[in-house]
Amino acid sequence: MTYIKGNTGKWEYVIGLEIHAQISSKSKLFSGSSTTFAAMPNSQVSYVDAAMPGMLPVLNKHCVHQAIKTGLALKAQINKYSVFDRKNYFYADLPQGYQISQFYYPIVQNGTMKILTSTGDLKTIRINRLHLEQDAGKSIHDQSPHYSFIDLNRAGIGLMEIVTEPDISSPEEAAEFVKKLRSLLRYIGSCDGDMEKGSMRCDANISVRRSGEPLGIRCEIKNINSIRNIIKAIEFEAKRQVDLIESGGIVIQETRLFNADSGETRTIRLKEEAIDYRYFPDPDLLPLIISDELINKLKANLPELPDQKIEKYMKEFGLSKYDAEVIVADESVAEYFEQAANECNPKMLTNWLTSELFGQLNKASIGISKCKITPSNFAKLIKLIENDTISGKIAKTVFEIMFETGKAPDKIVEEKGLVQVSDNNVLNTVIDEVITENPKSVEDYRSGKEKLFSFFVGQIMKKTGGKANPILVNQLLKEKLGS
């Protein structure tokens, strides 16, 4: 359990999340308008999106299927009967004057997702519901000192709002949940999870309490746009509430906004209750009826999910749970790994993948899909190390050339003359030279200064251009020095 340290003792975090995930679909939830990101403002707006009189919404079947698949992946109940409601409020980028959502009868309920806690234990986070709704447009305030502008390209794009129970007990758990959910959505293809583009947004409901006490008054932090900011926003808001209570104040139920630059939250408005939105069934849309046949068909076509892959990697490839989770977190990395792991030692591959390759990808700010090294060539590099053709040190040089050029490792080794020296006669000759050239060091070593052993190894590596087999060098050198 993670606690907040106050002046009067420890306080507990109580956190629930609302994730707004834009559905991966070529058209909007209730119209045929395109959903292409960053198009010219107001170029993807139909009469339905603009709320022109007499225009009726038509439900996008693909969006419904995406929601069902997501619900199945979350081990949730798919409701065969659900209803679209009007959520009434006025805002400039909501031309209808209401948002079409699902309040009373959502499409998905009662799901779960397990996350790994800081102690290494698995914790189940309950998911209250997943419902379908349409996104609002976008208000732009920084283009003019006198006017605000409205872009309706986003208006009507399908959203899945995924709401957890208040089961999350630390900022790190919240971040872990969002990371795992994002990975899951990407695997099934229902959302690309790009928080920078706003296709996945997070609201956090936060309250604090003493251990064993009832739930406190919560505040909602809106539109947190990165994993890092989830942690920062929750930490700040929880500490703000603790300081307020300890100084004799009262937490007001309100909606707040996190400022990433200052690291603080500020009040936007008092928190609304459901009654304020005057929900009622949308008269333009029939209830959504889902058949068992459709649910079973979508379930049968689900891809292998992250938790299933983790179990497979541990069982088939002998990976640790941690390594398996690191690889599985990104579907494209998992696909790359599987292609290479069938041709080489998977454990050694994992070490190189998570250290050398990830390091170079981060340095170049690219994803694995843009990597010039093919899975097959990566496997060849691992095999060259395994069969002692090259040393680990030389392999790093070869890897860097591969990353820049995409060349096969065996070609690079051949062109650069980097084959590891593993011939006993050749190595003994070099060792004899080093011993002859350093009589004082030999005498000191034999007198008990064993740290000099690494000096001799370094001299041998220098003479062989780093190509000497290090294991063989250690063995032969010890024999020569009589140790």
Swiss-Prot record:
Listed GO biological process terms: glutaminyl-tRNAGln biosynthesis via transamidation; translation
Transmembrane portions of the chain: none
EC identifiers of the protein: 6.3.5.-
Keywords per UniProt: ATP-binding, Ligase, Nucleotide-binding, Protein biosynthesis
Molecular function (Gene Ontology), one example: glutaminyl-tRNA synthase (glutamine-hydrolyzing) activity
Catalyzed chemical reaction(s): L-glutamyl-tRNA(Gln) + L-glutamine + ATP + H2O = L-glutaminyl-tRNA(Gln) + L-glutamate + ADP + phosphate + H(+); L-aspartyl-tRNA(Asn) + L-glutamine + ATP + H2O = L-asparaginyl-tRNA(Asn) + L-glutamate + ADP + phosphate + 2 H(+)
One GO CC term on file: glutamyl-tRNA(Gln) amidotransferase complex
UniProt cross-references to SUPFAM superfamilies, sorted A to Z: GatB/YqeY motif, Glutamine synthetase/guanido kinase
Domain of life: Bacteria
InterPro entries, A to Z: Asn/Gln-tRNA_amidoTrfase_suB/E (IPR017959), Asn/Gln-tRNA_Trfase_suB/E_cat (IPR006075), Asn/Gln_amidotransferase (IPR018027), Asn/Gln_tRNA_amidoTrase-B-like (IPR003789), GatB (IPR004413), GatB_C_1 (IPR042114), GatB_Yqey_C_2 (IPR023168), Gln-tRNA_amidoTrfase_suB_CS (IPR017958)
HAMAP family linked: GatB
Quaternary structure (record): Heterotrimer of A, B and C subunits.
Function in brief: Allows the formation of correctly charged Asn-tRNA(Asn) or Gln-tRNA(Gln) through the transamidation of misacylated Asp-tRNA(Asn) or Glu-tRNA(Gln) in organisms which lack either or both of asparaginyl-tRNA or glutaminyl-tRNA synthetases. The reaction takes place in the presence of glutamine and ATP through an activated phospho-Asp-tRNA(Asn) or phospho-Glu-tRNA(Gln).
Similarity comment text for this entry: Belongs to the GatB/GatE family. GatB subfamily.
PANTHER family: GLUTAMYL-TRNA GLN AMIDOTRANSFERASE SUBUNIT B MITOCHONDRIAL AND PROKARYOTIC PET112-RELATED, GLUTAMYL-TRNA(GLN) AMIDOTRANSFERASE SUBUNIT B, MITOCHONDRIAL
Name under which the protein is recorded: Aspartyl/glutamyl-tRNA(Asn/Gln) amidotransferase subunit B
Source species taxonomy: Bacteria, Pseudomonadati, Pseudomonadota, Alphaproteobacteria, Rickettsiales
